């Protein structure tokens, strides 16, 4: 169920402060965050935000199409290595 419109978007306060400070300083440095739950707002456009995936920070460049989504959607937490082909060595007849 999506978030109610009357509540507005949720952005962690510490992350929003970093974004506003970067906008005022006209800085394009990478902003490191652990806040995967924060929604992408228009103030973040053009910034690169390094989102933590549980092991390392994955850089995410914010574009217009990402507004309204959450940061965690762009940093997958699980690595898929593919399905195993038929293992004929382990099979007995």
From Swiss-Prot:
It comes from the Bacteria. Keywords: Ribonucleoprotein, Ribosomal protein, RNA-binding, rRNA-binding. Protein S19 forms a complex with S13 that binds strongly to the 16S ribosomal RNA. GO terms for cellular component: cytoplasm; small ribosomal subunit. SUPFAM superfamilies: Ribosomal protein S19. NCBIfam families: rpsS_bact. One of its GO terms (molecular function) is structural constituent of ribosome. The keyword Plastid does not apply. GO terms for biological process: ribosomal small subunit assembly; translation. It holds the Pfam family Ribosomal_S19. InterPro entries: Ribosomal_uS19, Ribosomal_uS19_bac-type, Ribosomal_uS19_CS, Ribosomal_uS19_SF. Belongs to the universal ribosomal protein uS19 family. This is Small ribosomal subunit protein uS19. It comes from Leifsonia xyli subsp. xyli (strain CTCB07).
């Amino acid at each position: 169920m999506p978030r109610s419109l009357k509540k507005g978007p949720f952005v962690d306060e510490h992350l929003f402060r970093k974004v506003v400070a970067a906008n005022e300083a006209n800085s394009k440095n990478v902003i490191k965050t652990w806040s995967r739950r924060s929604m992408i707002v228009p103030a973040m456009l053009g910034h690169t935000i390094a989102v933590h995936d549980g092991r390392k920070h994955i850089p995410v460049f914010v574009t217009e199409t990402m507004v309204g989504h959450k940061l965690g959607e762009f940093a997958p937490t699980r690595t898929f290595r593919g399905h195993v082909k038929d293992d004929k060595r382990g099979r007995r007849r």
